[in-house]
Regions:
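Core catalytic lobe of class I
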Residues: 2-260
Length: 261
């Protein structure tokens, strides 16, 4: 059983991800930007004042020995299952890019499952922040979350010009050098070889997103963690900030494209 909520531009389907993905057509989505369960710790370890599930004690509301917020969706290892990512792969258009968040200590398990499902992993984005807290005295302070960058088959360009950082004016003639072997001009800002003017598009996007550390991070896209106002009424402790998600969607999705989460 499932139900659908239709908004102006979005549709929310409350259903089992694997089972419902099987009902969708092939080659539908232009990109996938998702924050799947991290499958980390038990509810007892993370939340000492946990209450009984609000709507019941069975099914997806059952308290499990593992699972973020005590929910089955985080107690399971769906993000590590090749079968799940194969369904995501099937519904994406050729050349579509997948961006998926993961925890630092089990990123590799999700990445392997994504690769085994048929995706080509071509990079990783690091979302870096300075507001994390170590869970125990013998652990490092958490300061980043990795994001898998994977592609379905065909190599299509990212929307890099739409995600440039800052608004500095660059004179391309100052960023040209001659290759010693073939004497071809190389423009270090990713510009066309015959372009000789100036632009106001900011710096070339990097595979790092930061949350405002006390240093010179002008070359990287800035995005702080979601604050209390942005979280709204939800009590979920790991809500991703809207600016971060908008940036990622813009990076990998064509104009008027359809995004799978």
């Amino acid at each position: 059983n499932y139900y659908i909520i239709i908004m102006d531009t979005n549709k929310i389907i409350n259903a089992d991800s694997i089972e419902h993905l099987k009902t969708l057509d092939e080659n539908v989505f232009d990109s996938c930007v998702t924050d799947p369960p991290y499958h980390l710790q038990s509810i007892a370890e993370r939340f000492t004042h946990s209450t009984e599930a609000k709507y019941g004690t069975d099914g997806s509301f059952q308290r499990l020995s593992k699972g973020f917020m005590g929910k089955e969706w985080d107690g399971g290892d769906i993000a590590f299952q090749k079968d799940f990512w194969q369904e995501v792969y099937r519904t994406l258009k050729p050349g579509a890019v997948l961006l998926a968040f993961a925890a630092t200590r089990n990123y590799h398990r999700m990445a392997v499952a994504i690769e085994d499902a048929g995706f080509e992993i071509f990079d990783m984005i690091n979302w870096i922040y300075g507001s994390g807290f170590p869970k125990r005295r013998n652990l490092l302070k958490p300061a980043h979350e990795p994001i898998v960058m994977a592609r379905k088959g065909v190599n299509k360009d990212l929307n890099l010009d739409e995600c440039r950082v800052g608004d500095e004016v660059f004179d391309t003639s100052k960023n040209v050098r001659k290759e010693a072997m073939n004497k071809k001009a190389v423009y270090q800002l990713g510009l066309k070889e015959d372009y000789k003017g100036t632009i106001v598009k900011g710096r070339w996007p990097a595979n790092i997103i930061h949350s405002g550390l006390d240093t010179d991070w002008a070359d990287f896209f800035y995005c702080a963690k979601a604050n209390k106002k942005e979280k709204g009424d939800t009590e979920h402790p790991t809500v991703k900030p809207l600016d971060l998600m908008k940036y990622l969607v813009r990076l990998v999705t064509p104009e008027n494209g359809l995004v799978l989460d």
